[in-house]
């Protein structure tokens, strides 16, 4: 998120008296105040201006206080903590004239706060936002974890190399799984002009904006589609016993979601026999074909997974079939 400085002589809801104040518009009627967060920090002075041509009879209130905070067309607020944030309303004669919601974005020791999401610590520390693609179509899924269950709002924006914010469209974030201590949210994104066979020169940028009560945070991830590829598992696993042999031929098909043509977008497959005791596993066999010969014991399973043949993508989840 690029820091913006709202410097305007008249704004329908908020007018900032100082051009150096760290405040910017998140959406209509909602503003983020950026604060250095340490004991005795000076805070920020914010001047609100009521959207009315009149000068007299105006009162100001906040959802944080039952008292009248001031009178007149403008209200100066010293924002130092969350008790100073919230929704401010100007009225005249009981009628609401305008409202502004102030959120806080904390910076401690030069680092923006990351309190809302869980650090998944894979593949490295500070991995809050994770993304995967099933193919090279430009469609990908991102997800994140949070221990917070109420008063949450997420918004996701994406672009290719931050040059065209309209180039990648992301849907609405949804709760996809309740993991007990944590909630898993996900969002689907699609690059509008993706060319599966083209070499990527600029990474995709993803920005997740998170609001919990009066706290604002943002999280970013940057990647090439080729680096987040994880195919779906192979499908239609079949066993064909071989005569006079303990071996069987196992065959499978490419997942429906994988890019075509398969002659160009080829997969590598890993095949493994798993004994009745799931800890008992044979060495994995690798092949770029859609069949393999393996030894199949009673009560064992044969499982197959896939990854991009030419680029070291993540392996798919396993697909399995019983030897019985």
Curated annotation (Swiss-Prot):
GO process terms (BP): cell migration; cell surface receptor signaling pathway via JAK-STAT; cellular response to lipopolysaccharide; cellular response to type II interferon; defense response to Gram-negative bacterium; defense response to protozoan; defense response to virus; interleukin-12-mediated signaling pathway
Residues glycosylated per entry: 125, 135, 218
Chief location: secreted
InterPro entries found in the cross-reference section: FN3_dom, FN3_sf, Hematopoietin_rcpt_L_F3_CS, Ig-like_dom, Ig-like_dom_sf, Ig-like_fold, Ig_sub2, IL-12
Disulfide bonds: 50-90
Pfam families: IL12p40_C
Location of this chain's protein in the cell: Secreted
One Gene Ontology molecular-function label: interleukin-12 receptor binding
Residue ranges annotated for the Ig-like C2-type domain, each copy included: 23-106
SUPFAM superfamilies attached to this UniProt entry: Fibronectin type III (SSF49265), Immunoglobulin (SSF48726)
Residue intervals of the Fibronectin type-III domain: 233-324
Gene Ontology CC: one annotated term: interleukin-12 complex
Signal peptide annotation: 1-22
Entry-linked CDD domains: FN3
Keywords carried by this UniProt record: Cytokine, Disulfide bond, Glycoprotein, Immunoglobulin domain, Secreted, Signal
Assembly with partners or alone: Heterodimer with IL12A; disulfide-linked. The heterodimer is known as interleukin IL-12. Heterodimer with IL23A; disulfide-linked. The heterodimer is known as interleukin IL-23. Also secreted as a monomer. Interacts with NBR1; this interaction promotes IL-12 secretion.
Primary role: Cytokine that can act as a growth factor for activated T and NK cells, enhance the lytic activity of NK/lymphokine-activated killer cells, and stimulate the production of IFN-gamma by resting PBMC.
Similarity comment text for this entry: Belongs to the IL-12B family.
Record-given protein name: Interleukin-12 subunit beta
Gene designation per UniProt: IL12B
